[in-house]
Design a protein with these regions (language model features):
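Active-site helix-to-loop segments that bind/position phosphate- or nucleotide-bearing substrates
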Residues: 1-20, 29, 35, 89-251
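Terminal-proximal segments
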Residues: 1-72, 82
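A surface-exposed, charged beta-strand/loop segment in the N-terminal or early-internal portion
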Residues: 40, 48-121
């Protein structure tokens, strides 16, 4: 089993990143602020204007450490990673499977089963921790709706039908999202899921986190030789990592 490592987030503008021996170092204004052992890191995320030394990029490329560049406000600019490996025959088989309806349906069903199961577990965990009876019952009702939605998936004959089941389940889940945030220290609240643009702090955080996860999934796919754009649940669209978005659904 692969060991899960850390992500180094660099938030200070005008930082300078370089490597020394087996350490990833961050310097600000000529003063070294931190040195992190590379063996504990599998990705670096840089916010805003900063400089990354060429030797560090070479160092990261050889060790499979991805470097993501975002604007100060969190918009994705680009990502660096080392040589793409993987079996070309795997990618060939992936393309062939796009034209196999039974394979596509089974894969999408598995993805959505996992999504509904994980969403249900989140609701049940919140129900166990709340002290309010009304909230507890509402969260349990939401979990039951997700169970019923999952039970409907095997009877869906098309991927479009499964998308409809997933959409209804997502509505039930997000209708209870604010209940899981009660009494949070920051005072955040959630009304409804909004995108492009997200219209409040919680939606902005959700979209930002999804973006980071999508890039991580995309990088992992390319590393093993899969095409992140060749998706099954999300339709094919130029410039969109549809397959990475498919797997993101489970999270």
């Amino acid at each position: 089993m692969k060991k899960l490592l850390n992500t180094l987030y660099v938030l200070t503008p005008e930082s300078y990143l370089f490597c020394r021996n087996e350490n990833i170092c961050v310097q600000v204004g000529g003063t070294e602020k931190v040195a992190v052992p590379a063996l504990t890191v599998d990705s670096i995320v840089c916010f805003g204007k900063m400089t990354v030394s060429t030797p560090l990029l070479e160092f990261c490329g050889k060790r499979g450490i991805g470097v993501t560049f975002l604007t100060q406000s969190g918009h994705f600019m680009g990502r660096f990673y080392g040589p793409v490996s993987g079996n070309v025959l795997l990618r060939k088989r992936q393309y062939e499977s796009l034209n196999e309806p039974a394979f596509s349906r089974n894969l999408v069903q598995s993805i959505l089963f996992a999504k509904l199961r994980n969403s249900k577990l989140v609701l049940l965990r919140a129900a166990r921790t709340t002290k309010d009876d009304s909230t507890h019952n509402d969260l349990l009702a939401g979990a039951e709706l997700l169970t019923q939605s999952a039970a409907r998936l095997p009877s869906c004959e098309t991927i479009d039908a499964m998308r409809g089941v997933e959409g209804s389940a997502a509505t039930a889940y997000f209708a209870r999202f604010d209940l899981m945030m009660q009494n949070n220290p920051a005072g955040f609240c959630f009304t409804t899921r909004t995108r492009r643009p997200p219209r409040d702090e919680v939606n902005a955080l959700l979209s930002f986190t999804y973006m980071l996860l999508t890039r991580e999934i995309q990088s992992a796919m390319e590393t093993v030789g899969l095409d992140p754009a060749a998706g099954y649940l999300h339709t094919l669209r130029p410039g969109r990592p549809s397959f990475a978005l498919d797997l993101l659904e489970e999270l």
